[in-house]
């Protein structure tokens, strides 16, 4: 269970304060915060019937390399049919509205992590209900970014130490927000939001613990891959698909993520669609990353210290 001292505050989209900076986040303190909510339960709505989400998903799927991964129309229909069973609370759906208006990078990212993880889950999770459960976590894994200033999310130059800590804050913030809305700190979406940046070797954040949950790992790998192949403000362009797959393969070789989910991703990038268990993956690197990329680069503070509370 988490035990974190929060560096920054956590508020809902309607500016309801849940935690102040410096607060201790534990399951017990979150239960107390949940009890303060006067709403017993939030109305839910099917994700793909909300706004333009279904249309937007299909548009994003028409962008390479997703055109290769999702070239089978039946596969897309099966995915959409499963996705139509997934419902979200209105505050969660409103977070997607927020990202669509203020940060299209994050908006497209959470939708593509949703569809890609749902596809990979079909190979890796034999239980249908398990796949539905995982599918419901894709669009919410980055909900904590509503607590990160938009100028940080869109920054094109290296982040300062304070800005980097704000960005990493989104994992804990997502755990809190989803626990608050679902009234359940044990919900899989809460775990995914908190742990999708953890790694098998313990090198991730926010807790630096070994990632052991295979469901969370499907989201984690989908998250990494989409972030590489799509444009981002902090680099000169997207990774080409070969280089992106080499990066993800390299992470498996370093025991940061597991081989099964990486092989499933590679299998869907091959025209023959082999069984992921029969995929052979080369660890040789021949791709070329973008020439300008400041992801992970931290620079000196240039302005007044952060005093957010």
Question: Which residues does each PLM region occupy?
Answer:
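Residue-level signature of transmembrane alpha-helix interfaces in integral membrane proteins
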Residues: 157-158, 233, 239, 274
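Residue-level signal for pocket-adjacent positions within structured domains
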Residues: 5, 13-14, 91-94, 147-148, ...
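Terminal helices and disordered tails flanking the catalytic cores of nucleotide-processing hydrolases
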Residues: 1-93, 238-309
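Short glycine-/small-residue-rich flexible loop motifs, especially phosphate/cofactor-binding loops
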Residues: 30-31, 118, 175
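Short alpha-helical linear motifs
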Residues: 154-163, 192, 213-217, 265-270, ...
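Acidic/His-rich, divalent-metal-binding segments that scaffold phosphate/diphosphate chemistry
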Residues: 42-168, 180-185
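Alpha-helical scaffolding flanking metal-ion-dependent phosphate/phosphodiester catalytic sites
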Residues: 113, 136, 140-147, 165-176, ...
């Amino acid at each position: 269970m988490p035990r974190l001292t929060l560096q920054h505050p956590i508020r809902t989209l309607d500016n309801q304060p849940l935690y102040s900076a410096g607060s201790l986040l534990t399951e017990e303190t979150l239960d107390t915060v949940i009890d303060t909510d006067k709403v017993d339960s939030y109305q839910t709505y099917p994700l793909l019937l909300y706004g333009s989400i279904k249309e937007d998903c299909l548009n994003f799927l028409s962008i390479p390399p997703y055109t290769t991964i999702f070239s089978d129309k039946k596969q897309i229909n099966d995915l959409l049919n499963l996705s139509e069973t997934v419902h979200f609370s209105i505050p969660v759906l409103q977070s997607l509205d927020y990202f669509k208006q203020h940060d299209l990078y994050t908006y497209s990212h959470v939708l593509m992590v949703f569809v890609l993880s749902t596809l990979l889950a079909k190979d890796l999770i034999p239980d249908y209900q398990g796949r539905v459960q995982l599918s419901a976590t894709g669009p919410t894994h980055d909900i904590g970014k509503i607590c990160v200033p938009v100028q940080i999310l869109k920054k094109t130059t290296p982040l300062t130490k304070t800005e980097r800590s704000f960005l990493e804050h989104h994992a804990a913030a997502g755990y809190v927000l989803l626990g608050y809305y679902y009234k359940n700190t044990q919900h899989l979406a809460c775990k995914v939001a908190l742990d999708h940046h953890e790694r098998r070797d313990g090198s991730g954040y926010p807790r630096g613990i070994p990632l052991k949950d295979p469901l969370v790992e499907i989201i984690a790998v989908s998250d990494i891959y989409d972030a590489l192949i799509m444009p981002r403000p902090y680099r000169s362009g997207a990774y080409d698909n070969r280089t992106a797959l080499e990066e993800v393969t390299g992470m498996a070789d370093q025991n940061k993520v597991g081989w099964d989910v990486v092989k499933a991703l590679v299998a869907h990038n091959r025209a023959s669609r082999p069984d992921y268990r029969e995929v052979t993956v080369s660890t040789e690197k021949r791709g070329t990353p973008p020439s300008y990329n400041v992801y992970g680069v931290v620079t000196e503070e240039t302005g007044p210290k952060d005093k957010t509370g």
